[in-house]
Amino acid sequence: MSRNTATQFVAVLAAAAMGVYSLLVLGATTSLTGAASACQTWPSCNGQWFALQSLDLVVVWGHRTAAALTGLAVVGAAVLAWRTGASRRVRTAVTLALALYPVQVVIGAYTAMSAGAAPFTGVHLTLGVGIFASLVVALAWTLDAQTGDLPSAEWEGEPRHTDDGDPTQPGIVRAYVQLMKPRLMWLLCLVAGAGMALASSQLGAGQQLSAATVVLTLGGGVLSIGASGTFNHVLEREQDEKMARTDDRPVVTDRIPPRNALAFGVVLGVASLAAFAAVNLLTAVLGLTAIAFYSIVYTLVLKPNTRQSTVIGGAAGALPALIGWVAVTGAVGVGGVVLAGVIFLWTPAHFYNLALAYKDDYERGGFPLMPVVEGEAKTRRHIVYYIGATLASAVVLAELTGLGPLYAATTVLLGAVFLYFAIRLHRERDRRAAMRSFHASNAYLGCLLVAVVLDTMVV
């Protein structure tokens, strides 16, 4: 297939996938479910076509129009798959999506006429996720077929240092701050904040989220992240010395002796547990689990020994969601678990970009990450898989927690941006493309978490 045809096929596949995704999100959030009662007939609304007398009817007709346009995109993807000689597995996946789409439309019609009855809604959502998954898998396979055998661009020199701190200004305070990995704090605190916001919506009449709970939980989170980062600096100091990206870290350069760093980590850990315990005991237990998992299970067991360290290690980033939820409710709940699932699935789609950008560095450090042991093509393919899984889990979160239009718009628009940069990564295959995709992943999750907080507590 020609380059132009290949590019066109990828564009249509991506458009079809994101079209299906937008329908899923709109249907799962209150932006559609709240409007469904305004139109309980199909295909017209109470005998009228394109009646737009209210915002609810605008939402309904917008959804139905988008469904028609998305259907055309799915048909276009199927036609191109067969006409361009795509692989058998790609044709199978796209044809499956095409076959299921009319079924999805019929179930959607019954859902509308039954005023969103639970059985129809559940089947409608499940089938929609299946169609979306088929298109995402087809997209990943297509990109792999088009670019998997092509060489990656040569890296332009040694990677720049990305940790906080300036080796030309080795102030002791700066060095201790660097130990705490402050660049991780904003996003992980947002995760905990989103967990608290979701949990606050479950509180009964007369109950509300207190400022003390927020301060203690986020303060404990900052301290626990600092403790985990400090222990990581100490335990990985020999590997860090071999890597250009990390050979300026405080323990490696002996600005802070390992013994002092270890003591600092212990102080931070104890302080974090004290803050969490002031909220409730289960929050403290989860905080201790997070520190131990990152410092011991991930750093000592997973990262040096298995290419699946990124996937399994995602649990460390997911735990703040549970910590935030438990801080408010005192117990683990479904909303907190699903939010943690979103973070868990996002982690490989996020970190694999960094692993690609610094593949040679990680190889020098002796870390068997996926790009090192399985190759760059497979890693890029898995980034697309995990983007799809992350977006699907975000739909489940909306369905179970009643999030609204701000959340819907954020996950669709930023999800499309994330996918776009992953596609560019396949085309360009260099460090800059990997870092653009990495930053897009941060933007997606950061904006999504802010939307959760605003949709739950403000809008």
Swiss-Prot record:
It comes from the Archaea. Residues 1-184 are annotated as: Unknown. One of its GO terms (cellular component) is plasma membrane. Its EC number is 2.5.1.141. CDD domains: PT_UbiA_Cox10 (cd13957). InterPro entries: Protohaem_IX_farnesylTrfase, UbiA_prenyltransferase, UbiA_sf. It is found in: Cell membrane. Residues 185-459 are annotated as: Protoheme IX prenyltransferase. Carbon 2 of the heme B porphyrin ring is defined according to the Fischer nomenclature. It is a multi-pass membrane protein. The chain crosses the membrane at residues 9-29, 66-86, 93-113, 123-143, 184-204, 211-231, 262-282, 284-304, 325-345, 382-402, 403-423, 438-458. Pathway: Porphyrin-containing compound metabolism; heme O biosynthesis; heme O from protoheme: step 1/1. It is an enzyme of class 2 (transferase). The keyword Acetylation does not apply. Converts heme B (protoheme IX) to heme O by substitution of the vinyl group on carbon 2 of heme B porphyrin ring with a hydroxyethyl farnesyl side group. Keywords: Cell membrane, Heme biosynthesis, Membrane, Transferase, Transmembrane, Transmembrane helix. GO terms for molecular function: protoheme IX farnesyltransferase activity. This is Protoheme IX farnesyltransferase. In the C-terminal section; belongs to the UbiA prenyltransferase family. Protoheme IX farnesyltransferase subfamily. PANTHER family: PROTOHEME IX FARNESYLTRANSFERASE, MITOCHONDRIAL. It catalyses: heme b + (2E,6E)-farnesyl diphosphate + H2O = Fe(II)-heme o + diphosphate. GO terms for biological process: heme O biosynthetic process. The lineage of its organism: Archaea, Methanobacteriati, Methanobacteriota, Stenosarchaea group, Halobacteria. The keyword Lipid metabolism does not apply.
